[in-house]
Amino acid sequence: MVDSKKNKKQQVTDFSNLLSQSKGFVIFDYSGMSAVDATLMRKKLFNKGSKIKIVKNNILRRALKTSNFEGVDESVIKGKIAVAVGINEILETLKVVDSVVKEKELMKFVCGHFDNRIFNSDDLQKIAKLPGRNELYGMFLSVLQAPLRKFLYALQAVRNAK
């Protein structure tokens, strides 16, 4: 009994430290996910610099309290819960989880936390549709290049007209 209590306290401490070091996290219900799906998701998240943890609900509640994420509504933490933790980039983590949630109809977002805000499942689905940082850089560069490209085409047309 004592070992079990120490083990649970250690789990809370470890998970709380992980949450505190992260850029954000997404809590989702993994009811419809098979072991193969979980392994694939874990690999995708690892490649993005993120982690997935399946924890007991009470351990998650206590870890959220000890790491000062008190805005999360505890009533939504029920059932089979997994947490995707974004160590480097939370948006990429959210996109990976969203792609799996779309494939598996039984899975659903519960809530998430990043940028010092709590997001519900609807907000997370909307945010997941936004382009990533690299995509935005590409869009921005194409906007910058367009006038220059058109100017060069105009110069080429003038040159060909002579």
From Swiss-Prot:
Example GO BP: translation
Cellular component, GO annotation: cytosolic large ribosomal subunit
InterPro entries: Ribosomal_uL10, Ribosomal_uL10-like_sf, Ribosomal_uL10_bac, Ribosomal_uL10_bac_type, Ribosomal_uL10_CS_bac
UniProt cross-references to CDD domains, sorted A to Z: Ribosomal_L10
Classification via Pfam families: Ribosomal_L10
Key words, A-Z: Ribonucleoprotein, Ribosomal protein, RNA-binding, rRNA-binding
GO function terms (MF aspect): large ribosomal subunit rRNA binding; structural constituent of ribosome
Entries under NCBIfam families matching the protein: PRK00099.1-1 (NF000955)
Function: Forms part of the ribosomal stalk, playing a central role in the interaction of the ribosome with GTP-bound translation factors.
Matching HAMAP family: Ribosomal_uL10
Subunit annotation: Part of the ribosomal stalk of the 50S ribosomal subunit. The N-terminus interacts with L11 and the large rRNA to form the base of the stalk. The C-terminus forms an elongated spine to which L12 dimers bind in a sequential fashion forming a multimeric L10(L12)X complex.
Family: Belongs to the universal ribosomal protein uL10 family.
Protein name: Large ribosomal subunit protein uL10
